[in-house]
Amino acid sequence: MGRLFAQAGGSGLVHPGYGPLAPVRDLATGLPLLQLPEGFSYTSFGWAREPLDRDVPTPGAHDGMGVVAVEGDVVTLVRNHEVVAGWGSFAPAAASYDPRCGGGTATLRFDTRAGRFLGGHASLGGTVQNCAGGVTPWGTWLSCEEFVSAAGPVTLSNADHVLARDHGFVFEVPADGVSRAEPLLAMGQFKHEAVSVDPATGIFYLTEDTDPEAGFYRMIPKVPGQPVRGGRLQMLRAVGAPDLRSGRRVGERLRVQWVDIPDPLAGADAFGEGLGVLRQGLAAGGSRFTRLEGVIVGDGRVYFTATNGGDAACGQVWAYHPGAEVLELAYESPDPLELDYPDNVVLSPRGGLVICEDSDQPVQRLYGLTRGGGLFEFCRNHVQLEGQMGFAGDFREEEWAGACFS
């Protein structure tokens, strides 16, 4: 896929991609779960309720995921579970931040040559709404909470609970073993979506999934590669452009500055909205985005998506050039039929982006975006079950998430 991304141009859905899509049967279950171009195959694994180590059932609400280690043909992945519930942690006590909470991560091992799932274990628990995150250059996973609250009474999934600890943080998960379940406080307390690290500088870039206003952040660590040691949190300011939610032009380039966040831990505001960090950044002159989701560093750029940004409110893809301190609008969807609500995003090793869709459309799609701005549909969710794998229903409207390369 990467070679096509790197070589092709054009714009919109005029790009042919790999050709028409048709149902393809899963190599593991024999079910036609996806629609793909001719010649592509896939294997499903890690279904909800399937046992992990210690016979722990795999939680539902699969979300962000990344490859944290490769040993020969075996890849190790860490996957988020965006659970918003107070039924308790599924991870061991030592890896549980708040024992009342049901979100967290699972670490998985897969043999790519044999096409076989080797097993997995709970590696972080006691968190809430672990949405996306990101892989670090040193081989760990950063898991982001998209939920902000002070300790105390709270409603989770329409049920009343009492949180033992504050929430709205990023946690680090190793490739082997389990997380220390220690929040990385320098990354702030806000509705985190994703994070990506620039290997050249060690700077962390973070997105915030709030509507109608959101910020794009960076954290400059005191010690590169050791975010637990602290750092400086800042929000992006596009000079002369305080509002980037709409009214922008594809290819437009804006000069970037950064404003400091005085108190990164003041996210749980008095209004109960979890917008304390955002308000600090905007008051200091930071620029407004809306519903920032995926972020990935590569090719000397930092790409990130605004799910409902743009004049049609169908989504934007932004590219920040840290070397030049320039922000560029790389793509904007003009219509929900073209692309609706881009979410998780990953850079192909050969260039170009893979974009996960999370919209109100009846079928969710996986897209490729070439360096030249050409967009094409690569895959469709085709999951319809009648009791197979323990599930029944039409799941074609469920979001894509966790796209990654090994």
Residue ranges and their predicted role:
Residues 1-406:
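Sequence/structural signature of beta-propeller domains
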